[in-house]
Amino acid sequence: MKVYCLLLVLLVGLVSQAHGKPTKRCLSVCSAEYEPVCGSDGKTYANKCHLMTEACWSPTSITLVHEGKC
């Protein structure tokens, strides 16, 4: 049974690599601490973690412009 599970995990890994798209590893949980920052998209984010998470998932580049509200 252990061998079967190991083979299954390896197979899934090989199949995901065969598609050529790297898997994004974006943060999905940020603290609720409110330390607003302004993103290059003109939006105010609750904190730097929220901005970086949005930047990771966004198809366009989002960077930190300055600390504080936009």
Curated annotation (Swiss-Prot):
The keyword Disulfide bond applies. Disulfide bonds join C26-C56, C30-C49, C38-C70. Expressed by the venom duct. InterPro entries: Kazal_dom (IPR002350), Kazal_dom_sf (IPR036058), Prot_inh_Kazal-m (IPR001239), Prot_Inhib_GrowthFact_Antg (IPR050653). One of its GO terms (molecular function) is serine-type endopeptidase inhibitor activity. Pfam families: Kazal_1. Acts as a neurotoxin by inhibiting an ion channel. May also act as a serine protease inhibitor, since it possess the kazal serine protease inhibitor signature. This is Turripeptide Lol9.1. It comes from Iotyrris olangoensis.
